């Protein structure tokens, strides 16, 4: 580890292979906590490259719980968090809209870190069993079309690092890579990030991970979701090409909605918002979900255009299919699934 620390002190970038090896060392129980802390802080101070992010993601996915990965066409629509906006659970609500539109959703998430309610907190409040094993997750993806992967359970080797992150209380590379460490081999992905300057590096990592299509967004006001407040900065990965662009919500018929208007609350309050959206209630929450789910359906290829994606998202809700997926996941995740373990 000393060699890598010296390079970082000198402001040098690590190669992908060096970062992969450093990542394995970070996960080794024999490494000193002071070395982990120094590495994370020095890397952040230098600034992370796409090669470094990918190297660490490789190490984390290698040490994650093993998956059979026989499920084809899975997608995740996870944000990094860290925007401090305290919005309701946009991507988790959108996940059921995607599932209702026929997309297999492997939703990777955690409890609240910078917000009041994380995806795990919301789903637990709604009655979903968040403790599914890899075999159960495969079963749910195949038979329900949506499954939740509780990040701490999927990545047991990260327990020590999470403790050190909490003690450091400063942003590190781990604030950025959550959506990239999903242990399922995803075909497509929709990622929201709070740091605009990391849009391109994250898209490059998704390309290295073999995503067929992906969309990375930094919302207006530096939201880690697509925002109805104004211009959204976007990077699209398609046909192995990366294109940078921007998207205005007014172009798709949405009214401007300030980010403060879509603030959430505790898990009970956010569950009420999610159920309202999935039940077809008209609101700024619904419009925000339609915009995000529409973009995700475009990123997935289920929709050929963003307009078509928004139309499909609205149909998923208004037909009752999105809510049906939630109810199906609640029932199936709480069943005895010993037959698949």
Curated annotation (Swiss-Prot):
The entry's 5-phospho-alpha-D-ribose 1-diphosphate-binding residues are 79, 82-83, 87, 89-92, 107-115, 119
Documented EC number(s): 2.4.2.18
What keywords are annotated for this sequence in UniProt? Amino-acid biosynthesis, Aromatic amino acid biosynthesis, Glycosyltransferase, Magnesium, Metal-binding, Transferase, Tryptophan biosynthesis
Where on this chain does Mg(2+) 2 bind?
A: 224-225
Q: Which GO terms describe its biological process?
A: L-tryptophan biosynthetic process
Q: Which domain of life is it from?
A: Bacteria
Enzyme class (EC, first level): transferase
Q: What start and end residues bound the annotated signal peptide?
A: none
Q: Which residues bind anthranilate 1?
A: 79, 110
> Mind telling me which InterPro entries this protein's record contains?
Anthranilate_Pribosyl_Tfrase (IPR005940), Glycosyl_Trfase_fam3 (IPR000312), Glycosyl_Trfase_fam3_N_dom (IPR017459), Glycosyl_Trfase_fam3_N_dom_sf (IPR036320), Nuc_phospho_transferase (IPR035902)
GO MF terms listed in the record are:
anthranilate phosphoribosyltransferase activity; magnesium ion binding
**Free-text cofactor note:** Binds 2 magnesium ions per monomer.
Keyword Hydrolase tagged = no
Q: Which residues bind anthranilate 2?
A: 165
Catalytic activity annotation: N-(5-phospho-beta-D-ribosyl)anthranilate + diphosphate = 5-phospho-alpha-D-ribose 1-diphosphate + anthranilate
Which pathway does it operate in? Amino-acid biosynthesis; L-tryptophan biosynthesis; L-tryptophan from chorismate: step 2/5
| Chain sites annotated for binding Mg(2+) 1 | 91, 225
Question: Known PANTHER family for this protein?
Answer: ANTHRANILATE PHOSPHORIBOSYLTRANSFERASE
Q: Which family does it belong to?
A: Belongs to the anthranilate phosphoribosyltransferase family.
This chain's function reads: Catalyzes the transfer of the phosphoribosyl group of 5-phosphorylribose-1-pyrophosphate (PRPP) to anthranilate to yield N-(5'-phosphoribosyl)-anthranilate (PRA).
NCBIfam families named among the record's database cross-references: trpD
The protein in question is named Anthranilate phosphoribosyltransferase
Give the species this sequence originates from.
Answer: Bacillus anthracis
Underlying gene: trpD
